[in-house]
Amino acid sequence: MKKRIPTLLATMIATALYSQQGLAADLASQCMLGVPSYDRPLVQGDTNDLPVTINADHAKGDYPDDAVFTGSVDIMQGNSRLQADEVQLHQKEAPGQPEPVRTVDALGNVHYDDNQVILKGPKGWANLNTKDTNVWEGDYQMVGRQGRGKADLMKQRGENRYTILDNGSFTSCLPGSDTWSVVGSEIIHDREEQVAEIWNARFKVGPVPIFYSPYLQLPVGDKRRSGFLIPNAKYTTTNYFEFYLPYYWNIAANMDATITPHYMHRRGNIMWENEFRYLSQAGAGLMELDYLPSDKVYKDEHPNDDSSRRWLFYWQHSGVMDQVWRFNVDYTKVSDPSYFNDFDNKYGSSTDGYATQKFSVGYAVQNFNATVSTKQFQVFSEQNTSSYSAEPQLDVNYYQNDVGPFDTRIYGQAVHFVNTRDDMPEATRVHLEPTINLPLSNNWGSINTEAKLLATHYQQTNLDWYNSRNTTKLDESVNRVMPQFKVDGKMVFERDMEMLAPGYTQTLEPRAQYLYVPYRDQSDIYNYDSSLLQSDYSGLFRGRTYGGLDRIASANQVTTGVTSRIYDDAAVERFNISVGQIYYFTESRTGDDNITWENDDKTGSLVWAGDTYWRISERWGLRGGIQYDTRLDNVATSNSSIEYRRDEDRLVQLNYRYASPEYIQATLPKYYSTAEQYKNGISQVGAVASWPIADRWSIVGAYYYDTNANKQADSMLGVQYSSCCYAIRVGYERKPNGWDNDKQHAVYDNAIGFNIELRGLSSNYGLGTQEMLRSNILPYQNTL
């Protein structure tokens, strides 16, 4: 598990940039114009075996002890070159040593260069036996990469393993600019361990020191090393001034952590954000524990709560062991329902409505797999805390294909549902689903005939409170058996478009499906995990109307659809359009009186859906989709976007998204009852844009307008300045952050962020547009 981290002071001094860099275009090319390159043929092999060539105006010697070269002295060996006004070579016999000690003194305008570094100074010294080297009062400049500095004394030791600087400095800024630099009384760089030790380290902006540490051990190279990361700051209306100072801890080869003290002025305390990553035989995972010891704002707003501590715990794990065992964890829990309203966090959002806590262990071999899992939900609504958890759930699949012309499958599930409230129904559900398929296909079409049996048993408990308040009663023991029959046929027709577009190919792909499921009254079964599934074009051909198993709607229907695609001469899809409908011969029912459209007794063409994509050119693209459901008496959902994209930094995108309140209520019934902001549905039009506005300046913006509420939904604006040695990013974001029940409108949070990045320490010379686009609450999605 390898990690490269740009530390706060890391990779200072020449040694920081010995790793090869890949350079982005434009700005990177401009920056490299100020960096010297190695223009001599690169020599491979052991330099000790290569000849030494010396040129000078004058030479004299006392063989074999001394030799003096003066006047434009130029010494070359392999890739190394030494120039000076005067060079003195000394050779002395050392007692007990088979070889004499050979040293060199260089005086006046000393210039040393190779394929990695250039050293300049008035005086230099070297031991030719050990390769130890000293340069006094020197400047250094990296070759082929950014990085330069000064030192009172620069020393090479341990066969060039160690570089030691006395009163040294480093910056990645080009000559003539010292916007930032790092200085230290002593700096030791170990190339083998890829670490730099700094004593009395000072980070300076211009001539002003802004950070001091008596000792720092910083990573240099690919090996992971502990150290401070680049700090960050922002201002929000929720927390006022915020400051982050992350620290990276390299614990072991298979685990590391990032510890971030996060100061929030309005909260009056520091939140400790701790991220831990690990790799084991059972898989890889990540844990996050955020802890705020006390929150004065929360304490004022919730005076009846015993504690004002705020916390989040997140655990994600995925792994395979012995090729047959699967382990997965997706666990998020917070201290209170308001947590994601008050704090930004990449592991959750205030718009989610709930947090999931799921553990699963699976076993899989050929033709068989089984999974045991538990799933719980933490609902963020303070008004409705009722939610069901699966404790536990067993899923089993057995496959046997090519049984003659048939494919077979048996799916089984056993689950126990528990509610967070002690007066709600609970149940144990056992489900068995044998399936047999007859797939037939050739080059131009396919038909799949499927028959299955849906057999489910419920053992429901804790029914007294519910039955006493509802006219429809739940039964303790319920058996439901339903056959299902489906025939799904597809064809693909293809033609050349020589008359209209030479080299282009068009396909026509009709599809038809018949589905039959008999009606079973399910009013005596409580709805534990079912909700309406979205009916986009591909969803029209599902065998189910609802997710889960508690509501299986009857069906006597034909679904028809057609897709047409156009490919260019390089087989790239340039255009597609899909349109489909479901025609009901009889009403689709479950017997649940809470599903309002079942009382309408509707048949005929009830559900329509369409999707389209048009890659107009290499820079223009369009996507759209719409779903109409007559059972909801409305367009259920729709979305559209058109985009101009010149490259990753230059793009403009227009969007529209819509979801009817009836659709939200049908698909998210429990969340809809408490999510006041969605009672009128979603109807938003917006734009996203990114463009360099001047040399080294780029701007990103996003704006969405709620046409239902006639007000701004959310917006974002970011500006970044990029240079060869630093980048500064300033951003503003306004986003919804909860609902005010008293005033009946959304609550918004305004955030201003500020970030500085040191350049020249990595291959990133980008304008920052992609990072700013992804930071929005509704992140940019590519249309092309």
UniProtKB/Swiss-Prot annotation:
Protein's name in the database: LPS-assembly protein LptD
InterPro entries on file: LipoPS_assembly_LptD, LptD, LptD_C, OstA-like_N
Gene3D superfamilies registered for this protein in UniProt: Lipopolysaccharide (LPS) transport protein A like domain (2.60.450.10)
Subunit and partners: Component of the lipopolysaccharide transport and assembly complex. Interacts with LptE and LptA.
Source organism, top-level taxon: Bacteria
Gene Ontology cellular component list: cell outer membrane; transporter complex
Signal peptide: 1-24
Function: Together with LptE, is involved in the assembly of lipopolysaccharide (LPS) at the surface of the outer membrane.
Organism of provenance: Shigella dysenteriae serotype 1 (strain Sd197)
Subcellular localization: Cell outer membrane
Organism phylogeny: Bacteria, Pseudomonadati, Pseudomonadota, Gammaproteobacteria, Enterobacterales
GO annotation terms (biological process): Gram-negative-bacterium-type cell outer membrane assembly; lipopolysaccharide transport
Gene: lptD
Cystine residue pairs: 31-724, 173-725
